[in-house]
Amino acid sequence: MGLHCHTDLARAQALAQELRALGGQVGLYPGDVAERAQVDQVMEGFLQDFGHLDVLVCNAGLARQELFTDISLDSWRQMLGVNLDGVFHCCQAALPHMISRKAGKIITLSSMWGQVGASCEVAYSAAKAGVIGLTRALAKEVGPSGITVNCVAPGVIDTAMNGALSPETRAALAEETPLERLGTPEDVAQAIWFLASPAGDFFTGQVLAPNGGFII
């Protein structure tokens, strides 16, 4: 298993150690997915250590709330650079190796805001909508090579990314969700695991949405 990180190396190292303690073979590869050269280095390092790639999970993400009229060009480019360009870079780096083996799975991470849009998150919503479009189109292109491409689009998940939300906002979001709770990282992980497992072999070009019914 290869872990990639950019902003929090200490936490990534701790996770790698935890997985190794459970018996896993884990490599850690720092790099910025928005920079193609760094993605190529990550892929090269992984393939040197493990030989081949079975599953690629594109889950690097960045979120920021801004009024549309306040978004600077730099902010816009950063948001799309991480959330959309990063997926493009990772898929392009991985696909030659998957195509040569005629096997592989790619799982991208979008958001329910990529499906319906979010006020004050136009850049984020646009990037995540782009991820869904990329996933569906790429699934058609590489399906004949035996490669599946699917997307997970979570709802409101109880993570550090949403840590700035007030208790009142969190309660309101939970109330707005038919299952009356926020999602957990485990909810998202189970969706990814399903698509990566043999149970997901006949799924491609699909958007799996663990959102508790927030959007239906």
Residue ranges and their predicted role:
Residues 1-13:
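Conserved glycine-rich Rossmann-like NAD(P)H-binding loop of the short-chain dehydrogenase/reductase
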Residues 9, 30-42, 73, 186-187:
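The beta1-alpha1 cofactor-binding region of Rossmann-like NAD(H)/NADP(H)-dependent oxidoreductases
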Residues 67-68, 75-80, 162, 173:
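Substrate-binding pocket helix/loop in short-chain dehydrogenase/reductase
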Residues 88, 99, 103, 181-210, ...:
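C-terminal substrate-recognition "lid" of short-chain dehydrogenase/reductases
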Residues 91, 127, 135:
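Active-site helix of classical SDR
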Residues 96, 140-144, 201:
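Alpha-helical segment proximal to the catalytic Tyr-Lys
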Residues 111:
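Residue(s) in the substrate-gating loop at a strand-loop-helix junction
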